[in-house]
Amino acid sequence: MAFKLRIWLWSTNVRSLENVVEQIRNIANKTGIRMRGPVPLPVKRLEVPVFRLPHGEGSKYWEHWEMKVHKRLIDLEADERVLRHLMRIKVPEDVYIEIKQMTG
């Protein structure tokens, strides 16, 4: 029985993210299932200003730290065999995955 899956991937490291997307693409090509995506979603930019005080005399200034979160979206029409293949993917620690079954 085939069902639709929506896979959300996000990471701060683009290379790791693209590596996981490529593994999913290879599984889709090998098994012959329909795959839509990967759809690149807008990059979320998080900026944290930190007030920095020097020791002794001197001027006060702000440091700005930044983190970018890259996201991808993939839709698959999968069966149990494909789902087993997806669970065996080696995912780096800095890549987060969310898989949901779509209805309709």
UniProtKB/Swiss-Prot annotation:
PANTHER family: 30S RIBOSOMAL PROTEIN S10 FAMILY MEMBER (PTHR11700). This is Small ribosomal subunit protein uS10. Keywords: Ribonucleoprotein, Ribosomal protein. Belongs to the universal ribosomal protein uS10 family. One of its GO terms (molecular function) is tRNA binding. One of its GO terms (cellular component) is small ribosomal subunit. The keyword Ribosomal protein applies. InterPro entries: Ribosomal_uS10 (IPR001848), Ribosomal_uS10_dom (IPR027486), Ribosomal_uS10_dom_sf (IPR036838), Ribosomal_uS10_euk/arc (IPR005729). Transmembrane segments: none annotated. One of its GO terms (biological process) is translation. Signal peptide: none annotated. Involved in the binding of tRNA to the ribosomes. It holds the Pfam family Ribosomal_S10. The keyword Ribonucleoprotein applies. SMART domains: Ribosomal_S10. Part of the 30S ribosomal subunit.
